[in-house]
Amino acid sequence: MSEESLSDEMMLNYHLMHPGGDSRPGDPNLAYYVNGTYHLHYILKHRWCGPQVPHAPEGESFSFVHVTSPDMINWTWQKTKLQPSFTGHGMFSGTGFITKEGKAAGIYCGVSDPRQTFIVTAEDDNLDVWNKPYPVLPKGGPDGKDMRLVGDPDLFTVGETYYAYSASDDVQMCKSKNLVDWEYVGPLMKNGFSGVAIGEDLSCANMFPFFGKWMLLNISHFMGCRYYIGDWDEEAEQFVPESHGRMNWRRPEQSLENPEYRDFFAPESVLTPDGRRVMWAWLATIHPDVNLKTVQSLPRELSLHEDGALRIEPLQELTSLRYDRVAYKDIVYTVNPSAETDILDDKTVRGTQKIADLPGDSFEIEIVIERSRAEGKRFGFHIFADDDNEGLFFLMQTESGTIRLGEVEAPFDLSDVPSGEALRINVFGDKYLVEVFVNGRQALITTFMDYNKGQELRWYLFAGGMSFSANIWDTTAANMHIRKIDIWKLKCANEGLVEARDTRVWEPDNN
């Protein structure tokens, strides 16, 4: 790792991204932890002069680029093995799993004729040698015909039985004892679950045991990343969801009639050796200048709280990037009623105040506020700000139970935070990409392409309902006490990205 930021303005410092220029799609796939190494694959569309199949892009195909890491932060690109010159077809989304024999394996959608699902197994722990893939051909189906697994298949294990299903708005499932002989089971889960619109598909799925429950991480193509949490009914061989939540949030400029909210998309996860469930998501529509860069979100740790709610935290290993900490304690910020720039009208005031200079374009900020001091207030902060630039705005709207990062707004109810727990906001800045985590209960991500115009962190506090003509000043509303603010520089972890850009070791064959 280096303390120097990467000089290429579009090349991020510690987010995983493709080194080879424009590429789309970039779904993360086939994630494993094997013998001390994390393995992740992602889809790469590339030039292909070999045999063409119907409904595939002319002169193009799809491969799984392979990256490895000791810590899910520092990545090394490997030679691409799962590609059409080996498989005989293009490769689209699926899931990695470990067989009962302890081998890394994958189930995926083959860009083949006919389009169908394949299984591929690794011969070695480095994932350098793979066996030839073979199709999954279940017997039986809901209409008396043999069912077909086609798009975005997933596979999970219950006891000695493998279960598999593929993308659909009516997901059907099959099972096998040996990954070769498959038989139809029935629907994966109940239909008509509350909080889900009729017509939302279930794609890019990843189902796994989760803190005594089961989690079904997935997308709908129009609403982006989401999840179900529930139980596995062993007798019915069916997933019984108990709750549903979203991880992707609409921006104002996106259509309501044709919603395509894909900023946080196509998730994949892995189980660490110490029992943590870690996920990534492809940032598919995050910004026009970024959409073709195949950028992945920060790794997020998922857990289940005793109240049944999902917890989302940044990967613990990210703390290894921190250095040159600057700490501020017991900050009392007061809106200044005499400052003309603070007065919006005769009864409404807002204020912004510089707190610190940002330490470059790679940083983490942690802000801690006592819950009682935040209740009922609208407040937040600007990053990349100065006297001439507002920067990127984060807003906590306790009165409406929402938080906002730039144009992205998501639910967050301060009353859900126990009275003895402080409000904790973690901000990760990586050049133009910003991710914010709030108390492990919500996470937002956005871009800010003018990140280099301002280099200040500024605090914001809204205060209203004050009568200046009567010299009445509500000091409770106009003050904010911040317990602490910590700011760290973050080291650059993308030396492997630079090396792979130059060597192009990952580049697939074109025929």
Language model: regions and residue ranges:
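Beta-rich accessory regions
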Residues: 2, 223, 233-254, 258-262, ...
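Beta-propeller domains
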Residues: 2-20, 29, 35-80
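Blade-edge beta-strand/turn elements of extracellular beta-propeller
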Residues: 6-18, 70-84, 125-144, 173-197, ...
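Residues that flank catalytic or metal-binding motifs in active/ligand-binding sites
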Residues: 12, 27, 62, 92, ...
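Conserved loop/turn at the beginning of each blade in beta-propeller domains
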Residues: 24, 89, 146-148, 200, ...
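Hydrophobic core segments of beta-strands in well-ordered, beta-rich domains
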Residues: 27-55, 77-82, 92-121, 135-174, ...
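Beta-propeller blade signature
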Residues: 63-71, 117-125, 170-178, 227-235, ...
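Surface-exposed loop/turn positions within WD40 beta-propeller blades
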Residues: 168-170, 179, 222-224, 431
